[in-house]
Regions:
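N-terminal basic/disordered segments at the start of proteins
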Residues: 1-15
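Alpha/beta enzyme core
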Residues: 15-106
Length: 106
């Protein structure tokens, strides 16, 4: 494992106890707004101090998270055109490496 990967993982997984608490708010991607997650900005703000990282989509990050958010962001970079059918694995990469770098995500 190279230095950059170790550095990013150390920001997500606490080196003190080797554990992580990730707040995953990428659920709306599959089924639309989830109850209590309709206003992500209001939902995320009070929980930030309790989390080691935040998992979120690019659009939700841009619209619902302040740039001074205190914890690392793990970006969901996959997406699909439909949730119809049994198989939800019909996804592609939807975020470029350049976009991920611009967003400074882990």
């Amino acid at each position: 494992m190279d230095w950059g990967l170790k550095n990013r993982l150390a920001k997500i997984i606490s080196p003190a106890d080797n554990r992580a608490l990730m707040l995953a708010v990428d659920h709306g991607y599959f089924l639309g707004p989830t109850e209590k997650l309709e206003d992500l900005k209001k939902t995320i703000a009070p929980l930030a101090k309790h989390c080691d990282s935040l998992m979120i989509t690019r659009g939700a990050l841009r619209t619902s998270v302040n740039p001074d958010y205190p914890v690392p962001v793990v970006l969901r970079v996959s997406g699909g055109t439909s949730i119809i059918g049994e198989d939800l694995s019909q996804e592609d990469i939807t975020v470029s490496i350049k976009d991920a770098l611009r967003l400074n995500v882990a």
